[in-house]
Regions:
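Amphipathic alpha-helical linker/stalk segments
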Residues: 58-88, 126, 133-137
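N-terminal intrinsically disordered/low-complexity leader segments
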Residues: 1-9
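Short alpha-helical scaffolding segments that buttress acidic/His motifs in well-ordered protein cores
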Residues: 90-93, 106-110, 154, 158, ...
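C-terminal peripheral helix-coil segments that are non-catalytic and often amphipathic
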Residues: 127-139, 143, 157-197
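Hydrophobic alpha-helical connector segments
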Residues: 73-102, 139-151
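Helix-turn-helix
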Residues: 13, 17, 21-55, 59
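Short secondary-structure transition hinges
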Residues: 95-131, 149, 175-181
Length: 197
């Protein structure tokens, strides 16, 4: 293995470890020492490759967001029927919630700090989506409301349970396995709420 390959592999290991600590285990305050120990590398390598723990966190967050944005764009650009697009979007969002259970909690915490506001959707996509929603309402497939209310409903149904995961788990006295099962079951529930039969 070349030096460059070893360097690249070490960076990937550190990033994957950080992603696991931050977004799977919910340890947003994990230190460089904890990340290094978990990754099996020297702590100085984190500073060498990423300059700081906060920079590493931003990098892994941006990568997770980029992957999700790319998935959404593929769905939006497809020629699928509107309900099929929404179904794929819901499946992708729920899959991400299961893969990174604390990602939504992190996003909400960053929004509250004022440090996480990036335009997630281009104006052209937004206009097309609102137009498609209006068309579905006119066809009677969705209850009539302002199209943006449909988006609010969908996003709320998808994100809220994951964003308050620790609170739900504590108050409902359920473990990670049961919570993940409930999240996995949400696709049909959400579709039945959003669309008329």
């Amino acid at each position: 293995m070349s030096k460059q390959d070893k360097k690249d592999q070490t960076q990937v290991i550190i990033k994957e470890t950080a992603k696991n600590l931050f977004f799977v285990q919910g340890k947003f305050d994990a230190t460089t020492r904890e990340i290094a120990d978990e990754a099996g590398v020297n702590r100085t390598l984190i500073n060498y490759y990423f300059r700081s723990r906060d920079n590493l966190m931003q990098i892994v967050f941006d990568e997770a967001q980029r992957v999700e944005r790319e998935k959404s764009e593929i769905i939006q650009d497809s020629n699928l029927a509107f309900k099929d697009k929404i179904t794929l979007f819901i499946e992708g969002s729920l899959s991400t919630s299961l893969q990174y259970p604390y990602l939504e909690t992190y996003i909400v915490s960053q929004i509250n700090k004022g440090t996480c506001h990036k335009k997630d959707i281009e104006e052209a996509y937004k206009e097309k989506m609102l137009k498609d929603i209006q068309t579905e309402m006119d066809l009677g497939n969705i209850e009539k409301m302002e199209p943006i209310q449909f988006i609010f409903n969908m996003v709320s149904l998808l994100i809220f349970p994951s964003a308050v995961r620790p609170l739900f788990m504590e108050n409902m006295m359920i473990d990670d396995k049961e919570f993940d099962r409930l999240i996995a079951d949400r696709k049909d529930i959400i579709l039945n709420i959003l669309f008329k039969k």
